[in-house]
Amino acid sequence: MTKPKSPRNKTINLSIEDGRNYLARCISIDQVQTDLSQIINKTIIGDTFEVLSLLPPNSIDLIVADPPYNLTKTFHNTTFAKKSAPDYEAYTRKWLSCIATLLKDDGSIYVCCDWKTSLIIGRVLSDYFFVRNRITWQREKGRGATANWKNGMEDIWFATKSNKYTFNLDAVKTRKKVIAPYRVDGVPKDWDETCQGNFRNTCPSNFWDDITIPFWSMAENTAHPTQKSEKLFSKIILASSNPGDVILDPFLGSGTTSVVSKKLNRNYIGIEQNAQYCVWAEKRLETADIDKSIQGYVDGVFWERNSLSAQSSISKKDRAVNEQNTKR
């Protein structure tokens, strides 16, 4: 007998019929056209190398890529076999060379990786782009190792096509609680005194420790084994794109890049070869039509961990104003 699902469990589950309906919303490789207007805001089901060769050059403002890490894994009938370091580098070079021509001259690219593949990703990226930074984010999930340090970090490499690129610093500040408020002539210095507490909006660094891996009580959660959180990708998208820009994810997975792009009023193109992942992506995109909230992003800023009570106390009026500002 199947154990009933807890009311608090928000993991996306769909019937076979629902799956068919959502899959029908995707477009196949033979439907891909060089006319950008025909493929924008679409999930393309197919091999990313085949699809990338069909996309128009100089058409993408931002690329967010989460390629397979160099591990032998099988998920939902899709297998990636671990390669030697030279072979994985050749694989990386193959898809990056395809993408380089698609990015606009003022465009940016972010590539996710683990510690083993990070040096390869960084090296190959530098052959095609100007590498700007390496972001390391704390990944608090998984068991510890018995004869090694627990793997609790992942990297995201940030690069640009040229020296002219978008970076919206004010859009990605983090609101942190002020432990020792400092005043000048009785006036708060570099911090805000609010009914929720004393806070300072700080500039983001290249180390992110405020990310939560999606889990069963989060509405964005799917059964995808390596799903990235909406908060993680929203930082990237807010920083390196503007409303109306086109964002490409060549390894879409369960759709986080497309979903966040939609919530933040950007356009998206997602490529994914696994049909089940495409189904989850389309379901999440549908939900994004009625719920544009992003966990941990409230009042136009990102909040540090363990600040839910302060976030929740923000009035509905304040949230409505923030949503209006986001649409501008």
Located regions from the model:
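PRPP-dependent phosphoribosyltransferase catalytic core
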Residues: 276-328
